[in-house]
Amino acid sequence: MPESGIPVRDEIAGMIGLIQRVTRADVRVDGNVIGAIERGILALIGVRRGDQPEAAHRLLERLLTYRIFPDAQGRMNLSLRDIGGGLLLVPQFTLAADTQKGTRAGFSTAAAPDEARRLFAFLLEQAQAAHMPVAAGIFGADMQVSLVNDGPVTFWLETSAPAP
């Protein structure tokens, strides 16, 4: 890390997806449900500084193919695509925070709001083209997320930073 304390791009991992296997989930804004799914994945999405559309492509492929659902033998061998489950994407910039030091998160590693909004919208558009059903939260809104975590099963997915 440079003396400035701000990581350079190749020291920052790519986009983040905190995924939870759910039996149902919804997201609300001002008390109104704006997105809901039944069995599937709730994915909280963090965008880091320097992330590009390629990172969104890689993350989406992992969201759709990561094997977290049980097969007939109870083993996690099935993906969201395999079961035809729902995908609820919720933007959460705090996932991109630097929490390595102190007692307060730093956000120098998070993408600027306009950049993050653009990449989240791109991820959502790509998800809707590749899979159904897809629902989403609203970037920058104060949201309330409700879910029934199945298992519980929760994973932290990161795309790797592109090679320089």
Residue spans of the language-model regions?
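Short Lys/Arg-rich amphipathic alpha-helical segments
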Residues: 11-136, 150, 154-155, 159-164
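N-terminal amphipathic/basic-hydrophobic helices that include classical n-h-c signal peptides
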Residues: 1-14
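Beta-rich nucleic-acid/ligand-interaction surfaces
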Residues: 142-146
